[in-house]
Amino acid sequence: MAFVALPAGAQDTPAPAKMTAQQDHQQMMDQLHITSLRPGADGNHPQAPNAANYDEAKANPYPKLPDPLVLKNGKKVKSAKVWWSKRRPEIVEDFDREVYGRVPKATPKVTWEVTGTTQEKNGDVPVVVKKLVGHVDNSAYPAIAVNIDLTLTTPANASAPVPVIMEFGFVFPAGRRMPPPPAGSGLPWQQQVLAKGWGYAILIPGSVQADNGAGLTEGIIGLVNKVQPRKPDDWGALRAWAWGASRALDYFETEKAVDARRVGIEGLSRYGKAAIVTMAYDQRFAIGFVASSGEGGAKLHRRNYGEIVENLAGSGEYHWMAGNFIKYGGPLNWNDLPVDSHELVALCAPRPVFISAGAFKGDAWVDAKGMFLAAVGAGPVYKLLGKKDLGTTEMPPIETALTDGEVAFRQHSGGHTAGPNWPTFLEWASRYLGGA
């Protein structure tokens, strides 16, 4: 019989309490004194009573958005100083409390270990691939281990530290793979990045926090909470994934191959949501590529088009958000939210952010126009800080890039993918990240 030595204190630590997502969702509703929620939009059955709306004439029940440049006391923000010292903190507080949740003040230290280094070729470019694990200090609660999975790839022939684009990477179950890119879509995005002389990194969000409500007593949230259920303003998975990206950037600041001042963040779909949350909260990230992020990402919460607030308030997706967000799918409505996603984009200012969407066929759920309008709504903040906005308030034709300013937008003709927008993003990003 083999015996395994446990860390000091582990023998006295109870195993994580197992709750289903439905049970955890219900206990959060109980904390909030909510007895019922409105159903989310049904994207699969057009005849359902709660079928997703795709009629633009019905898409704007609340056309008036919160003004990002008006303080809570009603005074207008007329200077960058007042934005940074007063208005921006107000917006951050609202997102913390009501939308994404608060990161605890004392999160555990992460110690990075290089577990493997190989010399390879990606396409015809010699590269150095480093496999890394970020060991999260679990001495306060040894029953939960969190080890962040990160891979860094840099050009082997670089003569100086290079910019890096970090992606929140998908991991598919055995037997499933990411759908292949459409025919004629060009080089894989990694090879396009390498062609610029830059590096890329892939962070696995599930190694930081599970993508389900049952996992809230595991991962970094479960570790910090010592298995106890979340409070209504505790962080959800999107903030946890963003926290993981920030810890990866901590490592890049020590990595000689990387210019940590020129690190971008990219993500698609739920990881597009995580990418813009990362950009908004960590000002060290130089640039963002936010692809098909939809509701909970760059899409306006006040839009009735495709996925809506009620979807994220339900038991399938609530774990992405703060518990308090559930209120807006039940007793409160979208217009009661103190903020909207144009202010999330504004939190990225003055740094450049690229909002990406696909065509109606294949990507209608994420509401391309709702994301465009959020980019428009962030424009006044960018201009206040001396940067360029989108340059128009009119939704452009498909495949028309709006890339003259620090807020950029393009709707490609593909489906739910970032792929067709990579060349446009990289050309635009070169203005800010420069060469290797």
Which positions does each model-derived feature cover?
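C-terminal catalytic histidine-bearing segment of alpha/beta-hydrolase fold enzymes
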Residues: 320, 369, 374-436
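N-terminal pre-domain segments of enzymes
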Residues: 11-101
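Mobile cap/lid helix-loop segments that gate and shape the active-site cleft of serine hydrolases
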Residues: 220, 287-344, 367-394
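N-terminal cap/lid segment of alpha/beta-hydrolase-fold proteins
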Residues: 80-81, 85-89, 100-163
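Cap/lid segment of the alpha/beta-hydrolase catalytic domain
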Residues: 160-261, 294-303
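Primarily recognizes the serine-hydrolase "nucleophile elbow" in alpha/beta-hydrolase
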Residues: 172-181, 246-310, 316-317, 324-329, ...
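Conserved strand-to-loop "acid loop" that flanks and positions the catalytic carboxylate
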Residues: 349-368, 412-414
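N-terminal signal peptide c-region/cleavage motif recognized by signal peptidases
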Residues: 5-7
